[in-house]
Swiss-Prot record:
Domain of life: Bacteria
Domain Biotinyl-binding: 2-71
Pfam families per the UniProt record, alphabetical: Biotin_lipoyl
Post-translational modification N6-biotinyllysine, affected residues: K37
NCBIfam families: PRK05889.1
Protein name listed in UniProt: Biotinylated protein TB7.3 homolog
Keywords per UniProt: Biotin
Length: 71
């Protein structure tokens, strides 16, 4: 079953670490966000394959924004 990864805060996307098709493990960093001059990693809560990456470096995203989908 697909797992949506969503932003918990308003932030800028500093770095996209994974790409569609990548195999990832639980706890792997998916993207690095920046908010209030702090770098915040977004970690995978499940292992699987990244089926969608919905952000790019430099994007400003809102809380609840879909970052990626893991299947």
């Amino acid at each position: 079953m697909a797992e949506d990864v969503r932003a918990e805060i308003v932030a800028s996307v500093l770095e996209v670490v994974v790409h569609e098709g990548d195999q990832i493990g639980e706890g792997d960093t998916l993207v690095l966000l920046e908010s209030m001059k702090m770098e915040i990693p977004v970690l995978a809560e499940v292992a699987g394959t990244v089926t969608k990456v919905n952000v790019a470096e430099g994007d400003v995203i809102q809380a609840g924004h879909l970052i990626a989908v893991i299947d």
